[in-house]
Amino acid sequence: NGSIMGALYKGLIATGLLSIVGLGVANTLTVGWGEIGTVAGKSITGTNLFVCGLIGLIVTGLIVVITEYYTGTNKRPVNSXAQASVTGHGTNVIQGLAVSLESTALPAIVIVGGIIXTYQLAGLFGTAIAVTAMLGIAGMI
């Protein structure tokens, strides 16, 4: 349909799928899928590390979707700022500030959820794996 966001989403999905395959291959070649050690009495497996990478990719995808919602010209946040412009500068500034404060909540919740989930799975190393997966797909975005 000629939409730039459609092209971005197609590229993001393709990059995500290739990243999942790459994560699986790298995991198989480096640590395998079984237990690789213990941290603080908790067993860490290759599967845990793979899931941490998947969580990183999911967090990146969610942030893209949330960002598109808050910046899309046909979505409520942008339309509310445009509507506030009709009544004057003051209401425009107030509405813009309100939307900007609102727009930071969901990405923060998604990132914190990703950190908690990866830390529970594999400690700080699991969080590092997730962040590396996020950086691996960032080039597409």
Swiss-Prot record:
Pfam families: H_PPase (PF03030). One of its GO terms (cellular component) is plasma membrane. The chain crosses the membrane at residues 11-31, 46-66, 121-141. It is a multi-pass membrane protein. It catalyses: diphosphate + H2O + H(+)(in) = 2 phosphate + 2 H(+)(out). GO terms for molecular function: diphosphate hydrolysis-driven proton transmembrane transporter activity; inorganic diphosphate phosphatase activity. It comes from the Bacteria. Its cofactor is Mg(2+). It is found in: Cell inner membrane. Keywords: Cell inner membrane, Cell membrane, Hydrogen ion transport, Ion transport, Magnesium, Membrane, Translocase, Transmembrane, Transmembrane helix, Transport. The keyword Translocase applies. Its main location: membrane. The keyword Transport applies. Its EC number is 7.1.3.1. Proton pump that utilizes the energy of pyrophosphate hydrolysis as the driving force for proton movement across the membrane. Generates a proton motive force. Belongs to the H(+)-translocating pyrophosphatase (TC 3.A.10) family. Homodimer. This is Pyrophosphate-energized proton pump. It comes from Anaplasma marginale. The lineage of its organism: Bacteria, Pseudomonadati, Pseudomonadota, Alphaproteobacteria, Rickettsiales. The gene is hppA.
